[in-house]
Amino acid sequence: KYAYGPTLDGLFMQSNFGVVTKIGVWLMPEPEFFSVVEIMARREEDIVPLIDVLRALRLDGTVSTATIANWMRIAAGNTTRSEWYDGKGPLPQSAVERLMQEMGIGYWGLRFGLYGRERVVAQKLAAVEEAFSRIDGIEMTVASYKRGDKIPPEHSTLAGIPSVDLMPLNWLGGAGAHIECPLVVPMQGAQFLDLYRRRTELFNAAGFDHYCGLTSTTPRVFINTGSIIFDRNDAEQCARARALGKTLIEDAHKRRLAGYRAHISEMDLVASQFDFNDH
């Protein structure tokens, strides 16, 4: 949490410009009841109603936070690219469809938690089920826990238990690494689908699969992670990844979108996109 009054804390959050010597973390009391809601959508275009329904639930306070992952973000933590395709370039659509079918996942996965007294959570869950029932073809699963229950690893982060799982970086094998190009994007379904398809084109043109996630930090915007996963011991992949990162930043600027963080090698490029005080 920030200190009271004027503060410089924000200059050093998620940056390499400061060394943290003292930090305080506000802990939340364990709720009486906790439900994990997971929603799977099969088609790329399902992201439009998925986002629009979620936005309404965020605005009225039913859902406090949420994450959405595309097929690659879901799969990369449990498999590697070579298990599905050994050719060059991104996975062809036929391989993506086979991966989703055999792994039992959708094109999109939405996850969030509902917290509070058991009766309150039950009312929230009823509202969630009614709202998402309007989307054809989705599958919803719910897991619930009472205070003191043991939380399985797959639900631990939604229970406030940190995770340092780096498995997704193994997608291409070798020494897994990634460059992030995350944008702050409006929580509007049609607008995001257009952006997603454009960024997929850019990822694929550079020879990479599009690892995409959305984190609902406020009821009106997402943080859209765009992770370029590569083998840092492969010089050719490193060069392509760096070039793609620059391209993603420049393309986002044309859409009047900006990131909330960037690799230090791109900080001047990012800063040049803002015109306050003559850059």
Where do the protein language model's features map onto the residues?
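Activity-critical C-terminal alpha-helical subdomain
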Residues: R261-H279
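C-terminal substrate-recognition/cap domain of FAD-linked oxidoreductases
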Residues: V25-M28, S35, I39-R43, V48-I51, ...
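Alpha-helix capping and helix-loop boundary segments enriched in small/acidic/polar residues
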Residues: K1, L8-L11, A41-E45, E236-A239, ...
